[in-house]
Amino acid sequence: MRTLRIGIVGLGGIAQKAWLPVLTNTAGWTLQGAWSPSRDKALRICESWRIPYVDSLANLASSCDAVFVHSSTASHYAVVSELLNAGVHVCVDKPLAENLRDAERLVALAAQKKLTLMVGFNRRFAPLYRELKTRLGTAASLRMDKHRTDSVGPHDLRFTLLDDYLHVVDTALWLAGGEARLASGTLLTSESGEMCYAEHHFSADKLQITTSMHRRAGSQRESVQAVTDGGLYDVTDMREWREERGQGILIKPIPSWQTTLEQRGFVGCARHFIDCVQNQTVPETAGEQAILAQRVVEALWRDAISE
């Protein structure tokens, strides 16, 4: 099997913190280079990571089999379209595109070109969340909270819903097994239209699902709580596992070998995409799964602005 040639588009904060440490550890692939429209900044970053800088998106596409896209959401449609039309497989940060219509077009284009298009929902690959998912066969309720210390603004409601709350909705619905029906919800905004608090209630058969986010909670905390027939589960910040059963409380320590990026699912996400490209299999977050949560979140936003 030929070694997969990987490229990177976009070298912002998330790319530097979460993706470059994974992708520069070339286990089974080669990192051909990176491109960013901010040339001077990109050159400095590429030099520090010892990555070749490529002077255009077209040249990057011509030298790669697959590309990870970490550019701004506003650029996703144009960048991903160009890569797919050049015959390149793509893994892109969420959301797939700035609006649902463009996201659907990209899904259709990837299908037409018979290429892999995956959205990098890293939480689906967090080991503790994946383990929790196997324990939810008899779950009665599932609650996911993702709060911020003090992050009201500067962006508007729609931006924050798609940039951050989307993680909560996607992870909760994935843990619950897929689609769910919205029962009720609340969206509170500041006087200038910035998101302050969101809480929504969904149902999937007998399972009740709650998603919640406060933008000024005084704590940067993420947790998932599940009530099942015979056990209570609580996963905090993707690294603390607490399980309560009749015989007592089990708290699992973090494996000493597991890095933070592995705990948060970035390593698993990147490897899953690369494995799918190499083996010509369908990623877990491709097709409708790539845009399921975006459909829900955009509907929440439309409902909020129509009130």
Curated annotation (Swiss-Prot):
Keyword Oxidoreductase found: yes
GO molecular function: nucleotide binding; oxidoreductase activity
Keyword check for Oxidoreductase: yes
UniProt KW keywords: Oxidoreductase
Disulfide bonds: none
InterPro entries: Gfo/Idh/MocA-like_OxRdtase_N (IPR000683), Gfo/Idh/MocA_oxidoreduct (IPR051317), NAD(P)-bd_dom_sf (IPR036291), YceM-like_C (IPR048477)
Similarity annotation: Belongs to the Gfo/Idh/MocA family.
Protein name: Putative oxidoreductase YceM
Top-level taxon of the source organism: Bacteria
Species annotation: Salmonella typhimurium (strain LT2 / SGSC1412 / ATCC 700720)
Pfam families the UniProt entry points to: GFO_IDH_MocA, YceM-like_C
EC number: 1.-.-.-
